[in-house]
């Protein structure tokens, strides 16, 4: 069992929460053991059944261009993708995808094709996005307390949305205010976090980044963000030195954000208590202003 961790006031008062996915909201094994094998198994069928779709044509062109770049760069083992009829091209695309995935490459064209294949699986119910048991409750509480939640992952924005829309705990997209992938920058570069802050119009002091990767945490800290590391089951072991640099938690329930509302005298009180006090004081006909969703 993880030891109780003291979290600083800046962490617990953060208004913008930026979450990684793998190892943070979602098991690393889900991507490795479910999503990747599904893409490998179904990519050929997807291409055959959707060959004339514009999205397919676009991604095939992108894969071919990537293969040409790899060939020029003398990347070992590259599988070229020819032009011609689908029956000639599809087997080579499959080989190219298998080669890239065997190297754990994250090229844009590969991620796009994976996303197209996964979309079909999510929508027909073959895939349900894994999220840890504490995620839905935490997302709900954080948003109710006035926090905004953003996702920053190496997976494409489309793939992120599919995972959270079709999660094991239902549609979680309603809790999310934005999504970012590596188009905004690499996750181990300080500038990426600065760009996200600018995009969401947040100061670094009011932002919190949650991740399981020390190098990402370090980059975010260099950009001025508050950072907490996640120690989930199956994650890479954090060293003692890494644990000294950042607070480490095992679950989102270890983060307790207090909902605060300003009183007329300038003080602050817990949001739940404030509503209860107000409810006692207002006339019956005015209660809809306190509980706007109640008739």
Swiss-Prot record:
A molecular function GO annotation: acireductone synthase activity
Top-level taxon of the source organism: Eukaryota
GO terms of biological process kind: L-methionine salvage from methylthioadenosine
The record's cofactor note says: Binds 1 Mg(2+) ion per subunit.
Indicate the principal place this protein occupies in or around the cell: cytoplasm
Q: Enumerate the cofactors the protein uses.
A: Mg(2+)
Gene Ontology cellular-component annotations: cytoplasm; nucleus
Coiled-coil regions, chain positions: none
For this protein, what is the EC number?
3.1.3.77
**Keyword field:** Amino-acid biosynthesis, Cytoplasm, Hydrolase, Magnesium, Metal-binding, Methionine biosynthesis, Nucleus
SUPFAM superfamilies in the record: HAD-like
Disulfide bonds listed in the record: none
Region Disordered: what ranges? Answer: 260-295
The protein's annotated pathway: Amino-acid biosynthesis; L-methionine biosynthesis via salvage pathway; L-methionine from S-methyl-5-thio-alpha-D-ribose 1-phosphate: step 3/6; Amino-acid biosynthesis; L-methionine biosynthesis via salvage pathway; L-methionine from S-methyl-5-thio-alpha-D-ribose 1-phosphate: step 4/6
Q: Which reaction does it catalyse?
A: 5-methylsulfanyl-2,3-dioxopentyl phosphate + H2O = 1,2-dihydroxy-5-(methylsulfanyl)pent-1-en-3-one + phosphate
What role is this protein assigned?
A: Bifunctional enzyme that catalyzes the enolization of 2,3-diketo-5-methylthiopentyl-1-phosphate (DK-MTP-1-P) into the intermediate 2-hydroxy-3-keto-5-methylthiopentenyl-1-phosphate (HK-MTPenyl-1-P), which is then dephosphorylated to form the acireductone 1,2-dihydroxy-3-keto-5-methylthiopentene (DHK-MTPene).
PANTHER family linked to this entry:
ENOLASE-PHOSPHATASE E1 (PTHR20371:SF1)
Complex and partners? Monomer.
What the record says about family reads: Belongs to the HAD-like hydrolase superfamily. MasA/MtnC family.
* Annotated protein name in UniProt: Enolase-phosphatase E1
- Organism taxonomic ancestry: Eukaryota, Metazoa, Ecdysozoa, Arthropoda, Hexapoda
């Amino acid at each position: 069992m993880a030891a109780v961790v003291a979290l600083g006031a800046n962490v617990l008062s953060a208004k913008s929460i930026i979450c990684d996915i793998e190892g943070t909201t979602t098991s690393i094994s889900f991507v490795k053991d479910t999503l990747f094998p599904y893409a490998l198994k179904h990519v050929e069928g997807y291409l055959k059944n959707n060959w004339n779709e514009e999205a397919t044509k676009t991604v095939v062109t992108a894969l071919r261009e990537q293969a040409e770049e790899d060939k020029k760069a003398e990347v070992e083992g590259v599988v070229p993708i020819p032009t011609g009829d689908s029956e000639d091209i599809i087997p080579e695309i499959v080989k190219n995808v298998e080669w890239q995935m065997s190297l754990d490459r994250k090229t844009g064209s590969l991620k796009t094709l994976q996303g197209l294949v996964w979309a079909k699986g999510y929508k027909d119910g073959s895939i349900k996005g894994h999220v840890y048991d504490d995620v839905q409750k935490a997302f709900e509480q954080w948003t109710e307390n006035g926090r905004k939640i953003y996702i920053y992952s190496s997976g494409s924005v489309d793939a992120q949305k599919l995972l959270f829309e079709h999660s094991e705990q239902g549609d979680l997209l309603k809790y999310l205010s934005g999504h970012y992938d590596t188009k905004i920058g690499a996750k181990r570069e300080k500038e990426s976090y600065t760009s996200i802050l600018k995009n969401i119009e947040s100061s670094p002091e009011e932002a919190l980044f949650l991740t399981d990767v020390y190098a990402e945490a370090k980059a975010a800290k260099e950009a001025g963000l508050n950072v907490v590391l996640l120690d989930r089951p199956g994650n890479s072991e954090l060293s003692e030195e890494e644990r000294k640099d950042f607070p480490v938690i095992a679950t989102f329930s270890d983060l307790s954000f207090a909902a605060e509302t300003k009183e007329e005298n300038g003080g602050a009180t817990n949001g739940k208590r404030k509503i209860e006090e107000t409810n006692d004081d207002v006339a019956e006909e005015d209660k809809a202003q306190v509980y706007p969703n109640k008739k």
